[in-house]
């Protein structure tokens, strides 16, 4: 015969507290699941085969020449384009006509004045000599310079220095309209230029580092060259000492060596840690002295104590780092005193278990095993917390009930199932009635 099933309802306040705890556990599990899914997506993305982005293949010209019906220009656009082309051609013709007319007006003046000056020079009776020819050439040159002076209608052409020659001034005047003419002759299609694609594989050698980086690279190359030369000639003790000194300088120059604090810095950090430990001790005593009146206050107190424990672990880790730095700097006779000072910062010995340790693994399978075990440990912590809450809520109810009755037995079995079996199994009692 199966055991008697008793119906027992929990008090309202107890049920509300248990439901809140279970809901919090479910929310934390959902957050952990989202974090795992996010890290899983990142890991899958990193494990994929990386391929550089390929440049798009050029489209054949035949396809570009046959535009789609959606991109075909309308008749109004064609008319506006034709009118614009005609206006540009007319402006070019007008500019050419103005420039040609200006050149024709200036050329007869130049030739006529040059001929007049030549005739005036020939009218003077001079003996044919070398000096006379030089004077004639000089006068003719000056006449040409006066003839090529710009008129008042063109203010942009000012008088230049006297050493300028005639052909230079003529060239400046004839080419004055060159840039404007070229700008007018440009077709609208030349404005549409295609951007050239930059491929790192093909044109990566054209890139240049900034000046600071180039200096650092050259200095690093020189240092490594000296290091290789020191490795090849490593026969004597002097060479070994020089190489050791050089490596030390290399580490100091590159900034790769860890910063070792001095004695004053260690003492300053020790004072800060002493003050932090004193504050932590006071806060912990205050939290332990408070008697929680409800489960929410007790839960907040537990969270505060967990936070204080984390801060204490960080302080202990910092103490170990300072102790290692002082051990490397001080001689062996001062190590005992250093350990005593470091251990007395928080009023006790330094426990290596409280300090965070590095996670080391040799393969991906080992890393997967470590992650699985970490999740299992987190799950066990959650179960232990829930069992503690259930114990605090159910045991007082069991003690207040009258023992021996079926409801009390059912309540005991339910408490045992929740506290000892994790709610996975429920005990049943088989009892045979004695025969009459």
Swiss-Prot record:
Residue list for modification Phosphoserine: 161
A biological-process GO annotation: positive regulation of smoothened signaling pathway
Transmembrane segments: none
GO cellular component, one term: cilium
Subcellular location: Cell projection, Cilium; Cytoplasm, Cytoskeleton, Microtubule organizing center, Centrosome, Centriole
Chief location category: other
Chain intervals with Low complexity compositional bias: 111-131
Keyword Cytoplasm (UniProt): yes
Pfam annotation, one family: DUF4693
Biased composition (Basic and acidic residues): 153-170
Annotated region (Disordered), positions in chain: 53-76, 94-191
Annotated keywords: Cell projection, Cytoplasm, Cytoskeleton, Phosphoprotein
Subunit architecture: Interacts with TEDC1. Found in a complex with TEDC1, TEDC2, TUBE1 and TUBD1.
Described function: Acts as a positive regulator of ciliary hedgehog signaling. Required for centriole stability.
Name used for this protein in its record: Tubulin epsilon and delta complex protein 2
Organism of this sequence: Mus musculus
């Amino acid at each position: 015969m199966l055991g008697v099933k008793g119906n027992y309802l929990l008090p309202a306040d107890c049920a509300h507290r248990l439901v809140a705890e279970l809901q919090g556990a479910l929310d934390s599990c959902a957050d952990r699941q989202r974090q795992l899914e996010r890290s899983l997506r990142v890991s899958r993305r990193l494990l994929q085969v990386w391929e550089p982005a390929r440049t798009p293949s050029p489209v054949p010209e035949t396809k570009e020449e046959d535009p789609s019906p959606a991109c075909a220009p309308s008749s109004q656009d064609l008319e506006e384009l034709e009118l614009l082309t005609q206006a540009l051609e007319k402006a070019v013709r007008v500019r050419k006509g103005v420039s040609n007319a200006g050149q024709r007006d200036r050329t007869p003046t130049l030739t006529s004045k040059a001929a007049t000056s030549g005739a005036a020079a020939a009218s003077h009776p001079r003996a044919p000599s070398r000096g006379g020819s030089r004077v004639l050439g000089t006068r003719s040159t000056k006449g040409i310079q006066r003839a090529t002076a710009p008129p008042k209608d063109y203010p942009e052409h000012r008088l230049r220095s006297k050493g300028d020659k005639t052909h230079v001034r003529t060239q400046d005047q004839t080419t004055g309209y060159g840039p404007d003419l070229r700008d007018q002759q440009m077709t609208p299609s030349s404005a549409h230029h295609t951007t050239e694609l930059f491929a790192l594989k093909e044109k990566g050698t054209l890139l240049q580092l900034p000046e600071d980086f180039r200096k650092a690279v050259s200095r690093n190359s020189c240092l490594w060259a000296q290091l290789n030369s020191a490795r090849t000639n490593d026969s004597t003790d002097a060479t070994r000492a020089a190489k050791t000194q050089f490596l030390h300088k290399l580490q100091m120059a590159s900034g790769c060596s860890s910063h070792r604090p001095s004695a004053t810095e260690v003492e300053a950090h020790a004072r800060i840690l002493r003050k932090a430990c004193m504050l932590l001790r006071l806060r912990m005593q205050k939290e332990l002295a408070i008697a929680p009146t409800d489960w929410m206050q007790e839960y907040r107190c537990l969270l505060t104590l967990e936070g204080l424990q984390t801060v204490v672990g960080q302080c202990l880790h910092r103490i170990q780092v300072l102790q290692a730095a002082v051990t490397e700097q001080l001689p062996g006779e001062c190590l005992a005193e250093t350990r005593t000072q470091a251990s007395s910062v928080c009023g006790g010995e330094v426990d290596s278990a409280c300090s965070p340790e590095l996670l080391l693994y040799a393969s991906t399978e080992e890393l997967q095993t470590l992650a699985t075990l970490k999740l299992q440990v987190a799950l066990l912590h959650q179960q232990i917390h829930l069992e503690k809450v259930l114990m605090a809520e159910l045991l007082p109810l069991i003690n207040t009930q009258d023992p021996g009755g079926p409801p009390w037995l059912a309540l005991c079995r339910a408490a045992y199932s929740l506290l000892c079996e994790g709610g996975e199994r429920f005990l049943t009692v088989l009892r045979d009635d004695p025969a009459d």
